[in-house]
Swiss-Prot record:
GO terms for biological process, alphabetical: DNA recombination; DNA repair
Organism expressing this protein natively: Helicobacter pylori (strain J99 / ATCC 700824) (Campylobacter pylori J99)
Gene Ontology CC: one annotated term: Holliday junction resolvase complex
Superkingdom of this protein's organism: Bacteria
Region span, Head domain (RuvB-H): 256-336
The organism's taxonomic lineage, starting at the top: Bacteria, Pseudomonadati, Campylobacterota, Epsilonproteobacteria, Campylobacterales
Record's protein name: Holliday junction branch migration complex subunit RuvB
Binding site for Mg(2+): T67
Region (Large ATPase domain (RuvB-L)): 1-182
Length: 336
């Protein structure tokens, strides 16, 4: 399947641009108000006690600001943040090298934390609970455990698949936050702020139109903003007006609901099953897509907006999907 403009993964060329558009202060971070409020209280209390923050877990679909909010936490705590990802921590020595280089109150951010191996988790437990690193030297009867004290630090874990976390690891987080999709008004404000940073003039209705098609996700909103900006430049227009915006979004294949070809193919597959549950492996095979991508990228927004139901037997299209695709149900009074 061709690359999606509404793909939720960060593309390589976007990394530096994302950093430049990233909010640096609470007042710059739009949305997630309940999470922000709770974090501000926790940060204030930790600073008054002169302690590190409790370990915390952020979970939810990609692109909702887990990394950005972690950077703000570090700035508010006036400390350093070390960013890594679980797939990069292959051996206990990798984790030990990271932990022993942390300073007091530093923040360690581990993305995709659900992908840590059980062996790495075992090393992490005493580090989280007792700020102690247990290293085993040798093997068999001659093996010895060396205990190394660590400075108090805060572990921030981020995951798109909280259900895959082991219970012992999940229980060691003092705070757990579910990141929510953003409203169109929040996304419109994010888009206008980003456009200002890019020195790009944009009409209010253009920002609103991009926001409507951004699947409740800032990462997608910023990506669409930059692509529409390219169209405006090619059209020799210094202003992103509604006409250019609509033309660009239609050319990019993103409809009024934020759906693209992959979303519509997914929904058509379910709707044509006429109420019969469709298994994830069947969907993945039909779409030639990875099961994890379907679960983490395609389904969350569709599920949150009522276009499908997940059951023990598989996925089922809702009446909302049948109405959208104009695919009638064979027996609507008994299907749902």
């Amino acid at each position: 399947m061709k690359e999606r403009i509404v793909n939720l993964e960060t593309l390589d060329f976007e990394t530096s641009q994302e950093v430049s558009l990233r909010p640096n202060l609470w007042e710059d971070f739009i949305g997630q108000e309940k999470i922000k409020s709770n974090l501000q209280i926790s940060i204030c209390a930790a600073k008054k006690r002169q302690e590190s923050l409790d370990h915390m877990l952020f979970f939810g679909p990609p692109g909702l600001g887990k990394t950005s909010i972690s950077h703000i936490i570090a700035k508010e705590m006036e400390t350093n943040i070390k960013i890594t990802a679980a797939p990069m921590i292959e051996k206990s020595g990798d984790l030990a090298a990271i932990l022993t280089n942390l300073q007091a109150k530093d923040i360690l951010f581990i993305d995709e934390i659900h992908r840590l191996s059980p062996a790495i988790e075992e090393v992490l437990y005493p580090a989280m609970e007792d700020f102690r690193l247990d290293i085993i030297i040798g093997s068999g009867p001659a093996a010895q455990t060396i205990k190394i004290d660590l400075p108090p630090f805060t572990l921030i874990g981020a995951t798109t698949r909280a259900g895959m976390l082991s219970n012992p690891l999940r229980d060691r987080f003092g705070m757990s936050f579910r990141m929510q999709f953003y409203s169109p008004s929040e996304l419109s404000l994010i888009i206008k702020k980003a456009a200002a940073k890019l020195n790009q003039d944009i009409k209010e209705e253009s920002a609103d139109e991009i926001a409507k098609r951004s699947r409740g996700t800032p990462r997608i909103a910023l990506r669409l903003l930059k692509r529409v900006r390219d169209f405006a430049l090619v059209k020799n227009s210094s202003l992103m007006d509604l006409s250019i915006t609509l033309h660009a979004l239609n050319e990019l294949g993103v409809n009024e609901l934020g759906f693209d070809e992959a979303d519509l193919a997914y929904l058509s597959l379910l709707a044509n099953a006429q109420g019969r549950p469709v298994g994830l492996n069947t969907i993945a095979a039909s779409m030639r897509e990875d099961e994890g991508t379907i679960e983490d990228v395609i389904e969350p927004f569709l599920l949150a907006n009522g276009y499908l139901e997940r059951t023990a037997k598989g996925r089922i299209a809702t009446p909302k999907t049948h109405a959208l695709l104009k695919i009638p149900t064979l027996n609507p009074q008994t299907l749902f």
